Amino acid sequence: MSFYDDQSGNLSPQRKLGRGKIEIKRIENTTNRQVTFCKRRNGLLKKAYELSVLCDAEVALIVFSTRGRLYEYANNSVKGTIERYKKACTDSPNTSSVSEANAQFYQQEASKLRQEISSIQKNNRNMMGESLGSLTVRDLKGLETKLEKGISRIRSKKNELLFAEIEYMQKKEIDLHNNNQYLRAKIAENERAQQHMNLMPGSSDYELAPPQSFDGRNYIQLNGLQPNNHYSRQDQTALQLV
């Protein structure tokens, strides 16, 4: 019986395929990972079936997908094969050796992970300009190239954000200017309407308008237009004496 979990499947670091060597590691793209899972799962089920038929072996296969969906195959019964496996492990005198082998395997995996972590930390220190003593001229040139590319991408992204911010502020300035012009036009329109209302007859402002101030020139000018009653009386007196 074989157990295979796509989340923690343990395979050799590399597998020889017809078109060359590929690195066996987790597929980051979700769609590609799902497609590969379906293909490999079907192939695994087919191999289990062929093994049970060709070799007359009792085979039970259990696969859990990333989403927790169960896929299984057994030429007899999965539960029966599992019970047989448990009984064989209990009765086997090599139970301790199996546990030791499992412990050794996990120790090796932990050691690999520690090495990967150490390598990543070293690369990070090199990127910061630290721990450069062990690097060769070729390594330093490669590191310099990586840093230049990284700085170029960072500057490009920074300029992109700055241009977007400038464009946004310019648009905001135009909007504020348009709003200011609109408000000025509305204020001028309201003032003209108010002046027009004040000049209309019958309005309270028109009736309560203050009288014009006294002007002597206007008074003399108005008297000059009136008939001279003094000379008129003298003429009348002369007519009466004759």
UniProtKB/Swiss-Prot annotation:
Q: Which compartments is it annotated to reside in?
A: Nucleus
Q: Which InterPro entries does its entry note?
A: MADS-box/MEF2_TF, MEF2-like_N, TF_Kbox, TF_MADSbox, TF_MADSbox_sf
Q: Which Gene3D superfamilies match?
A: Transcription factor, MADS-box
GO terms for biological process, alphabetical: positive regulation of transcription by RNA polymerase II
Q: Name one GO molecular function term.
A: RNA polymerase II transcription regulatory region sequence-specific DNA binding
Any transmembrane segments, and where? none
Q: Which domain of life is it from?
A: Eukaryota
| Transcription regulation among keywords | yes
In this protein, which residues make up the domain named MADS-box? 19-73
The chain positions of domain K-box read: 103-193
The cross-references to PROSITE patterns, in alphabetical order and at most eight, read:
K_BOX, MADS_BOX_1, MADS_BOX_2
An example GO CC term for this entry is: nucleus
Where expressed (tissue)? Answer: Flower. Preferentially expressed in stamen and carpel and weakly in petal. Undetected in leaves and roots.
> Is rRNA-binding a UniProt keyword of this protein?
no
Which controlled-vocabulary keywords does the entry list?
Activator, DNA-binding, Nucleus, Transcription, Transcription regulation
This chain's function reads: Probable transcription factor involved in regulating genes that determines stamen and carpel development in wild-type flowers.
Which PANTHER family does its entry note?
SERUM RESPONSE FACTOR HOMOLOG (PTHR48019)
The name of this protein is Floral homeotic protein AGAMOUS
- Give the organism the record lists: Panax ginseng
Taxonomic lineage from the root: Eukaryota, Viridiplantae, Streptophyta, Embryophyta, Tracheophyta
